[in-house]
């Protein structure tokens, strides 16, 4: 079913109506992407009930996505808030102007992280990059010269993606990478356009790395560093059918990357902004 190359079973539910169908053909229909099959003759009330069930499924999936967004937004960790506030208090005695700058960045970070639009199913790369920049500006103040930030981003790159997909990866790189090294270290964010509708995102750090045994648990709910990673991986699979790629070497660093392939009908960041204004 070609339509499944552009729409998932949740994005566009499909009900097949047929005069006659055997078991093997049913299997092929479901395997091709059908949500339900209705065989003739059928009563109008059954037809409407099947349609309502598919609509309810789509609505429930959308609600679940919004709940996931709210959950991710709630993952701003108390220790981060505590550390930022302590940094601001310390700076008020040393550098009032710097304290003001950090306060502004902190305000921007909270505002964008809890932006109402972030509870929707989609955002844009540039919006997420703004959140990342505010977050890193705060952390660079806290870590001073112990944190180096590198960017390798195509100049005009922008695309649609689920919100809060990249910032948690950057936060993990700082928290579990750079902060674990006595002399500090670096993190690097790479964003490249691979083809017309394909984008490659990678977050790297030169922290202590992760053992092969722990790498197996990275996308489970039982590993501390996986807070947010499992959720990101699930949403990535739902959004474009790909998964997070994790590579780590003990004492050398960690790399987490994703390949985002957009369907022709996904839309553009400009269309997203136009929708938000209406």
From Swiss-Prot:
This is Putative uncharacterized protein YwpD. It comes from the Bacteria. The gene is ywpD. InterPro entries: Bact_2-comp_sensor_kinase, CheY-like_superfamily, HATPase_C_sf, Sig_transdc_His_kin_internal, Sig_transdc_resp-reg_receiver, YpdA-like_HATPase. PROSITE patterns: RESPONSE_REGULATORY. Residues 1-55 form the Response regulatory domain. It comes from Bacillus subtilis (strain 168). One of its GO terms (molecular function) is phosphorelay sensor kinase activity. GO terms for cellular component: plasma membrane. GO terms for biological process: signal transduction. PANTHER family: SENSOR HISTIDINE KINASE YPDA (PTHR34220:SF7).
């Amino acid at each position: 079913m070609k339509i499944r190359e552009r729409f998932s079973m949740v994005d566009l539910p499909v009900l097949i109506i047929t005069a006659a169908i055997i078991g093997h053909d049913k299997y092929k229909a479901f395997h091709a992407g059908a949500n339900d099959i209705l065989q003739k003759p059928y009563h109008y009330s059954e037809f409407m009930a099947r349609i309502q069930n598919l609509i309810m499924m789509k609505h429930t999936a959308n609600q679940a996505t919004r709940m996931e967004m709210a959950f991710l937004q709630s993952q701003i960790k108390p220790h981060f808030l505590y550390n930022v506030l302590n940094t601001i208090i310390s700076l008020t005695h040393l550098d009032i102007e710097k304290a003001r700058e950090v306060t502004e960045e902190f305000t921007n970070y909270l505002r964008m992280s809890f932006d109402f639009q972030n509870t929707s199913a989609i955002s844009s790369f540039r919006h997420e990059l703004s959140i990342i920049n505010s977050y890193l500006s705060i952390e660079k103040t806290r870590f001073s010269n112990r944190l180096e930030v590198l960017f390798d981003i195509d100049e005009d790159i922008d695309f649609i993606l689920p919100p809060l997909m990249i910032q948690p990866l950057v936060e993990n790189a700082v928290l579990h990478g750079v902060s674990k090294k006595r002399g500090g270290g670096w993190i690097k964010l790479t964003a490249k356009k691979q083809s017309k509708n394909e984008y490659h995102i990678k977050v790297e750090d030169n922290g202590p790395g992760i053992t092969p045994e722990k790498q197996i648990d990275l996308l489970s709910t039982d590993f501390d560093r996986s807070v947010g990673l499992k959720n990101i991986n699930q949403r990535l699979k739902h959004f474009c059918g790909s998964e997070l790629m994790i590579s780590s070497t003990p004492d050398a660093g960690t790399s987490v990357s994703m390949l985002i392939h957009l369907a022709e009908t996904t839309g553009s960041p400009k269309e997203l902004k136009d929708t938000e204004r209406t």
